UniProtKB/Swiss-Prot annotation:
This is ATP-dependent Clp protease ATP-binding subunit ClpX. Residues 3-56 form the ClpX-type ZB domain. Component of the ClpX-ClpP complex. Forms a hexameric ring that, in the presence of ATP, binds to fourteen ClpP subunits assembled into a disk-like structure with a central cavity, resembling the structure of eukaryotic proteasomes. GO terms for cellular component: HslUV protease complex. ATP-dependent specificity component of the Clp protease. It directs the protease to specific substrates. Can perform chaperone functions in the absence of ClpP. Coiled coil: none annotated. One of its GO terms (biological process) is proteolysis involved in protein catabolic process. NCBIfam families: clpX, PRK05342.1. Keywords: ATP-binding, Chaperone, Metal-binding, Nucleotide-binding, Zinc. CDD domains: RecA-like_ClpX. Belongs to the ClpX chaperone family.
Length: 424
């Protein structure tokens, strides 16, 4: 900071960057031994914005191929090959479309939002989370059951955009290229086929409210969240390029699809859809827009979800793989917990099969695996920190079935294995 002249001028402050005096600029901000004017701050902001834009363009050019996307999904999600293919192609095309828009204006490519239909615990949420991780874009999840129309008690649909903005650290440009996953979308279906005379604020009303942001609109988002009021300043977020993925278990939809199959008089559909012994996931593969309309989704909402990916029930082999194969597999997680006590945790192959069968019986899919393992290992995790000399814990099929206790193998004497026979 320099001071020029004499008299009054010796008390004049100057910008350390451009040299302008405090009288030539609107604001002069003081730092330790330096000053910066508002014009230099604006110039610095412009430079940063340009750098951010150029880095964004680089990421746009590096869109992973559908095969690359599918390969990474395989690391985290077991099975569901058909759903992975549909998602990989849809997401690749979505970001290719954004890249196309920055270079060409002759043909406008429409956005293709995605609907995931599958039984509970089949991997819908995990697929969406993994996609966001692959693409390194802002990602947020919303629960459709908490949403209501604007003005009613509950969460506004625009709060979804606020959450996305928060995950992008309030970088509007990054948020506008993000992914929104709306779970439990089947819970906002219309309560009956006929329009009701009473207001359905958490069903059809929410579908109507979601239409605009899914298609593309400029949403006014209150930065601090909560309800809007006139004195508030809003952030403007364009939702045109945000990819919406909706997921739901759609319990009962298989009956609608099967009923349609039985009414088919000719062709292959009657034989394909009618059998009662077909698994839910297999029946979902034959879903048509008319089935979703009968279920209670309004036509405009179904039209906003042109890509439909169906997930199948997980069989015993798939559930066993989920326990051991992914990078964040449950068995690996518990083994790491036991390693912290310097103890090795071992599961017999038959034990993993028994855990998988329990999950199938409970109809909870992969989501139920953790609770089953927690109940099996509860007593062991309670006792172990107070025991000395335990080197290994072995879980057998009998332990899972509740007819025996885990086998404790001690380091000092192999014959001191604590093996409790089947309880009566």
């Amino acid at each position: 900071m320099s001071k020029v002249g004499t008299g009054d001028s010796k008390n004049t402050l100057y910008c350390s960057f451009c040299g302008k005096s405090q009288h030539e600029v609107r604001k002069l901000i003081a730092g330790p031994t330096v000053f910066i004017c508002d014009e230099c701050v604006e110039l610095c902001m412009d430079i940063i914005r340009e750098e951010n834009k150029s880095s964004l363009v680089k990421s746009r050019d590096g869109i992973p191929t559908p095969k690359e996307i599918c390969k990474v999904l395989d690391d985290y999600v077991i099975g569901q090959g058909h759903a992975k293919k549909v998602l990989s192609v849809a997401v690749h095309n979505h970001y290719k479309r954004l890249n196309h828009q920055t270079k060409h204006n002759d043909v406008e490519l429409a956005k293709s939002n995605i609907l995931l239909i599958g039984p509970t615990g089949s991997g819908k949420t995990l697929l969406a989370q993994t996609l966001a991780r692959i693409l390194d874009v802002p990602f947020t999840m919303a629960d459709a059951t908490t949403l209501t129309e604007a003005g009613y008690v509950g969460e506004d649909v625009e709060n979804i955009i606020l959450k996305l903005l928060q995950s992008a650290d309030y970088n509007v440009e990054r948020a506008q290229r993000g992914i929104v996953y709306i779970d439990e979308i089947d819970k906002i279906s219309r309560k009956s086929d006929n329009p009701s005379i009473t207001r359905d604020v958490s069903g059809e009303g929410v579908q109507q409210a979601l239409l605009k942001i899914m298609e593309g609109t400029v949403a006014s988002v209150p930065p601090q969240g909560g309800r809007k009021h006139p004195q508030q300043e809003f952030l403007q977020v364009d939702t045109t390029n945000i990819l919406f993925i909706c997921g739901g278990a759609f319990s009962g939809l298989e009956k609608i699809i099967s009923a349609r199959g039985r009414t088919t008089s000719i062709g292959f559909a009657a034989q394909v859809l009618a059998p009662e012994d077909r698994r839910t996931g297999e029946i979902f593969r034959h879903v048509e827009p008319e089935d979703l309309l009968k279920y209670g989704l309004i036509p405009e909402f179904v039209g906003r979800l042109p890509v439909v990916a169906t997930l199948e029930d997980l069989d015993e082999a798939s559930l066993k793989k989920i326990l051991t194969d992914p990078k964040n597999a449950l068995v690996k997680q518990y083994q790491r917990l036991f390693e912290m006590e310097n103890i090795e945790l071992t599961f017999a192959d038959e034990a993993l099969g028994a855990v998988a069968r329990k999950a199938i019986e409970r109809k909870t899919g992969a989501r139920g695996l953790r609770s089953i393992l927690e109940s099996i290992l509860l007593e062991t995790m309670f006792d172990l920190p107070g025991l000395e000399g335990v080197e290994e814990v072995v879980i057998s099929r009998e332990v899972v079935e509740g007819t025996a206790r885990p086998l404790y193998i001690y380091a000092d004497r192999a014959d001191r294995a604590s093996e409790t026979s089947a309880s009566a």
